[in-house]
Amino acid sequence: MATPSLISETEAWKDLKAHLEGIKRTHLRELMGDTERCQSMMVEFDNIFLDYSRQQASPDTINKLYKLAEAAHLKQKIDRMYNGDHINSTENRSVLHVALRAPRNSAICSDGKNVVPDVWNVLDKIKDFSERVRNGSWVGATGKELKDVIAVGIGGSFLGPLFVHTALQTDPEASKNARGRELRFLANVDPIDAARNISGLNPETTLVVVVSKTFTTAETMLNARTLREWISSALGVSAVAKHMVAVSTNLPLVEKFGIDPNNAFAFWDWVGGRYSVCSAVGVLPLSLQYGFAVVEKFLQGAHSIDQHFSSAPFEKNIPVLLGLLSVWNVSFLGYPARAILPYSQALEKLAPHIQQVSMESNGKGVSIDGLPLPFESGEIDFGEPGTNGQHSFYQLIHQGRVIPCDFIGVVKSQQPVYLKGEVVNNHDELMSNFFAQPDALAYGKTPEQLKKENVSEHLIPHKTFTGNRPSLSILLPTLDAYRIGQLLAIYEHRVAVQGFVWGINSFDQWGVELGKSLATQVRKQLHASRVKGEPVEEGFNFSTKTLLTRYLEATSDVPADPSTLLPKI
């Protein structure tokens, strides 16, 4: 008998569907009363503690999810990824971001070639270059040290490095290394973003890192040309070679742009943009800011999870457990979203990065074989650090829609504060909420409890909390470069597990192409209208034509062939 093409056709999927009704009838108050169950839903690896006992699941549910993983050939798919098979079938590519953080003596192959030596050649080049910039042996065109870095990229070339940078800013070791230096990220083609990035900076002390694999990404290259003009108008055209470097594989276009090809840092087709933070995309700007030694610890942390993911049995495998639980929440319980709630301000950019990793990877409507999916896949990811989120969207999470939550806590703060006379210190206050919120979601508050508290009858419906809202808790011992790398890799592999089980390609992103191609048509129309005065006519529907015409009429003062104008703030 042939293997079913869709995971939903397997007996394991059908068994979970049959199991679903019993779980729906069981409140988390009851499930949490079973100590043995709770103990079985706690896993530890390298002092990272995962508690998923507040999921709407019994031990039987978890066992059935293991059966689903087996039916999806999850272990074989993980092995195929590590072996360099072309699991990104629509682009015929390997998926080897694990190679980016592999030790120097490792062997990870793509198309029969060990790619690890290539990775380390680039890492060694980054180490050498970043150290020369940091120690002042590489200087700008006027002889001044380059203390400020603007990394120009978009999507995965921006969100991942920004997450790591923000997390490292308050780490004692990293912040000490970064003293007197500044790292900024320019992503949006909106000129306001360029204005904010160059505000207060001196071109003489600024180094620009342009990140584009092909060196043709429209938004990135327009921003790069804007910064090139900013530098050359102040220092002369020849200064570009000293003040701009590239992360790219297209050396001819790098050279044509004015950047010395020797100052281009490579990455490869087997690295997807949203998985590229451990490549030169992230390692170069982060090393310039914090020093290569700190960034190497980040890579080592990610590698430790890579090893755990590839070797740990499923019942002890943190990314596998997280991925299977997400499949359960989305495709069976019908919860379309997930809140990522780190109780650490240093992780404020985690949710935006994972939003891209998850939604661009798993926002697919067809299987890897091109069959329409008869079930929901992918989830809407969002989040905010605690306790900020509690005063923002937690109202909906507690009394509105059911949204599974990831609570992420850190045992030791990067920046402890102790005030004499306070009942608890600042970090204890933060963590009090970290421990309380999952229970509030799970247990809720019943009308009977409110009556015992003598709450007015008319307020009881408003103060009732239904509870039975799933969450999980991840407790990290610290938040240094190593742990940040671990957290990144946990979420990367979790997303892969979901895609492997759903049977989709988590490593392409055709959904971003249509809007880009339509924007090309609009761009041509804007140019024709500005330069030749042509009206908006053919090729647009009435709505778009109306909006475009209003825009052009309101910006008729924009010159057709303007002289260069740079931001002024």
Swiss-Prot record:
Keyword terms: Cytoplasm, Gluconeogenesis, Glycolysis, Isomerase
Active site: 360 (proton donor), 391, 516
Main location, first listed in the record: cytoplasm
A GO MF term: glucose-6-phosphate isomerase activity
GO cellular component: cytosol
GO biological process, one term: glycolytic process
Transmembrane stretches, start-end: none
Enzyme class, spelled out: isomerase
Pathway: Carbohydrate degradation; glycolysis; D-glyceraldehyde 3-phosphate and glycerone phosphate from D-glucose: step 2/4
Catalytic activity line of the entry: alpha-D-glucose 6-phosphate = beta-D-fructose 6-phosphate
Pfam family, one: PGI
InterPro entries recorded: G6P_Isomerase, G6P_Isomerase_C, Phosphoglucose_isomerase_CS, SIS_dom_sf, SIS_PGI_1, SIS_PGI_2
EC code(s) of this entry: 5.3.1.9
Cellular location(s): Cytoplasm
Protein family according to the UniProt entry: Belongs to the GPI family.
Subunit structure: Homodimer.
Protein's name in the database: Glucose-6-phosphate isomerase, cytosolic 2
Gene source species: Clarkia xantiana
